[in-house]
């Protein structure tokens, strides 16, 4: 520092000493009247724009040796001063750097310490986490074991429950079977008791009837004996009267004639006996039959006239009132057999189309109900398959589902067949209706043509009405209705008037 002060003092002295001649010289240059221009002190070069500081002026003329030495010394002093300043700055910068390095080391040490502390904390935390994870894994293993044990327990409980339920169901079925068997036995016993009571009552009635019949037979036997006695008396009386009459009337008749008469009498008795047995119909007394005055015996819709017709038929020998054997001349056994055959044929007659349609609709309804039940079972099985915990149960349910799908397909085929058959019946019914309509149209056209040709609508008798076919009456009524509708449509309100 002392050297720096000495150099600074010497530099200031030299600068003062150098400054004085320059001032004197400058004054000389300024005050001298010369033809040359003064060279600018701040431009080292004339052809360039470079400028210099006023502390370092440029001289246009060469300096003297002393001045050059002074300028060199001055420059050296400036350099020394600059170097001193740089050294001082360097020392200060070194000091600041040492301070900064110390501070940086402190900061680094603190950061390293913090990192080590954080690492230690992280390691501790990681150790705690690993210990917690191990404890959690142990707990999970224990819970899994407990869960497996609980599953096994639930399976065993379900198996036991199913076995108990199956036993209960089997016992219930056996009990129901026993109950039904006992009930059937009791019903049979009741039926047997009822039949026994019926038989006892029937037996009592039969015994009563037998007693009544025996009494009647006894009475009839007595009556028959009386009649036989009376007949014998009458026969003897008749014989005596005949003999008396023959003796009186023809005393000279030969014996052969008497024999013939005697032979011819027994068949007459037989014919008189068989007369009532061979009656073909009821013979009524004409005096008991009434007569309605003013009524004809022709067929009519009036009830009184029909009564008169019946009375007329009963008075005459009408085959309508005779026995079937008389009319048909067929034995009774054959007639019964023919009636049985007719009844069988009538019983075998096919059912009507309406009954078939009703039966088909009922069958279709039942099939559709069964198909709906199967679809519901299908949905339930699908839910059970989704919720099934084990693979075995899932396989069993899938097998059941496949079987159910097969049954559903078969049921759908049955439904389609029934619907096809129903559609065929509907088509046949429509075709029949079309044919009937065509036939009715033809008959109506024929009737129109016949009515247009004749122009007279005659009234049909009862015999002609009976000769008509079964559908003719309906067709005629339909045609009459159509004609009335056409007449009503053809009439207008203006054409109608009332005559008073």
UniProtKB/Swiss-Prot annotation:
It comes from the Eukaryota. Pfam families: Cep57_CLD, Cep57_MT_bd. Residues 58-239 are annotated as: centrosome localization domain (CLD). InterPro entries: Centrosomal_MT-associated (IPR051756), Cep57_CLD (IPR025913), Cep57_MT-bd_dom (IPR024957). Residues 63-242, 392-492 form a coiled coil. Residues 434-450, 461-471 have a biased composition (Basic and acidic residues). One of its GO terms (molecular function) is fibroblast growth factor binding. Residues 1-34, 43-62, 434-472 are annotated as: Disordered. It is found in: Nucleus; Cytoplasm; Cytoplasm, Cytoskeleton, Microtubule organizing center, Centrosome. Keywords: Coiled coil, Cytoplasm, Cytoskeleton, Microtubule, Nucleus, Phosphoprotein. Residues 1-17 have a biased composition (Low complexity). GO terms for cellular component: centriolar satellite; centrosome; cytosol; Golgi apparatus; microtubule; nucleus. It is linked to Mosaic variegated aneuploidy syndrome 2: A severe developmental disorder characterized by mosaic aneuploidies, predominantly trisomies and monosomies, involving multiple different chromosomes and tissues. Affected individuals typically present with severe intrauterine growth retardation and microcephaly. Eye anomalies, mild dysmorphism, variable developmental delay, and a broad spectrum of additional congenital abnormalities and medical conditions may also occur. The risk of malignancy is high, with rhabdomyosarcoma, Wilms tumor and leukemia reported in several cases. Homodimer and homooligomer. Interacts with microtubules. Interacts with FGF2 and RAP80. Does not interact with FGF1 or FGF2 isoform 24 kDa. Belongs to the translokin family. This is Centrosomal protein of 57 kDa. It comes from Homo sapiens (Human). The gene is CEP57.
